[in-house]
């Protein structure tokens, strides 16, 4: 499978530079004026520890019908355990599943305390796009 990696710091992905099946894009989605992979279809999208509400729809749109979305990030209540503490970066209860439910079949959803690797309040969803 071809894989596209997108992060604001791609230094940990340097070993993928010569891999013909890997595309590495450096972009800070919190400050970017546009969604850098908009319009490109993906059979699977994985998002971890990231929330930028104004592009959440773009992320979901990037998944092809029949494709898989795996999304996990921090939720309200995480302030007790560490960063992020700013509500701008914390999902409200049920926010992720409400956003995804319209166009995806939900395979699994969790909201609560994750203990490993470190305590945090998270929301995560696995869903297939209709």
Model-identified regions with their sequence ranges:
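Class I SAM-dependent methyltransferase SAM/SAH-binding core
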Residues: 1-33
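Short conserved AdoMet
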Residues: 17, 64, 101
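A short acidic, Gly/Pro-enriched loop at the edge of an enzyme's catalytic core
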Residues: 30, 34-44
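A short, conserved alpha-helix within the catalytic core of class I
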Residues: 50-64
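Conserved beta-strand signature within the Rossmann-like core of class I S-adenosyl-L-methionine
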Residues: 66-79
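Acceptor-substrate binding/catalytic loop of class I
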Residues: 79-94, 116
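Short alpha-helix
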Residues: 87-110
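Core SAM-dependent methyltransferase catalytic element
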Residues: 112-130
């Amino acid at each position: 499978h071809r894989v596209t990696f997108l992060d604001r710091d791609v230094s940990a992905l340097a070993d993928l530079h010569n891999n013909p099946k890997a595309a590495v894009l450096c972009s800070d989605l919190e400050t970017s004026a546009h969604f850098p992979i908009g319009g490109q279809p993906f059979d699977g999208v994985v998002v971890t520890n990231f929330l930028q509400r104004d592009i959440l729809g773009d992320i979901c749109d990037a998944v092809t019908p029949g494709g898989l979305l795996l999304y996990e990030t921090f939720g309200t209540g995480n302030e007790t355990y560490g960063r992020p503490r700013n509500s701008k970066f914390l999902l409200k209860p049920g926010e992720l599943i409400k956003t995804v439910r319209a166009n995806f079949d939900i395979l699994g959803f969790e909201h609560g305390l994750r203990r490993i690797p470190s305590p945090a309040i998270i929301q995560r969803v696995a869903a297939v796009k209709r």
